[in-house]
């Protein structure tokens, strides 16, 4: 499973639905993620990919779509 598939799987679990066909849809505008789910997402991504994504440095505009989450994780991995 590649990075994108792994991230989509994490998102699907947190959101509770398949978002693989909504890769550019805004989680927050669509009410799919709230603050608690966002913290859960960051913790899951940190654990799975051994990255640091502190909540204190979270910029919603950089994490608001599945494609942006993938890009952000890729940038944090190296």
Swiss-Prot record:
Protein family: Belongs to the DltC family.
Species classification: Bacteria, Bacillati, Bacillota, Bacilli, Lactobacillales
Leader sequence segment: none
InterPro entries on file: ACP-like_sf, DltC, PP-bd_ACP
GO terms for MF: D-alanyl carrier activity
Residue ranges annotated for the Carrier domain, each copy included: 1-77
Protein's UniProt keywords contain Cytoplasm: yes
GO biological process: cell wall organization; lipoteichoic acid biosynthetic process
PTM per Swiss-Prot/TrEMBL: 4'-phosphopantetheine is transferred from CoA to a specific serine of apo-DCP.
Role according to the record: Carrier protein involved in the D-alanylation of lipoteichoic acid (LTA). The loading of thioester-linked D-alanine onto DltC is catalyzed by D-alanine--D-alanyl carrier protein ligase DltA. The DltC-carried D-alanyl group is further transferred to cell membrane phosphatidylglycerol (PG) by forming an ester bond, probably catalyzed by DltD. D-alanylation of LTA plays an important role in modulating the properties of the cell wall in Gram-positive bacteria, influencing the net charge of the cell wall.
Taxonomic superkingdom: Bacteria
Compartment(s) where it occurs, according to its Swiss-Prot or TrEMBL record: Cytoplasm
Protein's UniProt name: D-alanyl carrier protein
Organism the protein comes from: Leuconostoc mesenteroides subsp. mesenteroides (strain ATCC 8293 / DSM 20343 / BCRC 11652 / CCM 1803 / JCM 6124 / NCDO 523 / NBRC 100496 / NCIMB 8023 / NCTC 12954 / NRRL B-1118 / 37Y)
Gene3D superfamilies: ACP-like
Modified residues (O-(pantetheine 4'-phosphoryl)serine): 35
Assigned keywords, A-Z: Cell wall biogenesis/degradation, Cytoplasm, Phosphopantetheine, Phosphoprotein
Associated pathway: Cell wall biogenesis; lipoteichoic acid biosynthesis
UniProt GO cellular component terms: cytoplasm
């Amino acid at each position: 499973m590649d990075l994108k598939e792994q991230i989509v799987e994490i998102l699907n679990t947190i959101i509770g639905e398949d978002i693989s066909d909504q890769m550019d849809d805004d989680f927050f505008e669509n009410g799919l993620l709230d603050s608690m789910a966002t913290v859960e997402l960051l913790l899951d991504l940190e654990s799975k990919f051994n990255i640091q994504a502190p909540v204190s440095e979270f910029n919603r505009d950089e994490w608001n779509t599945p494609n942006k989450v993938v890009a952000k994780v890729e940038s944090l991995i190296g």
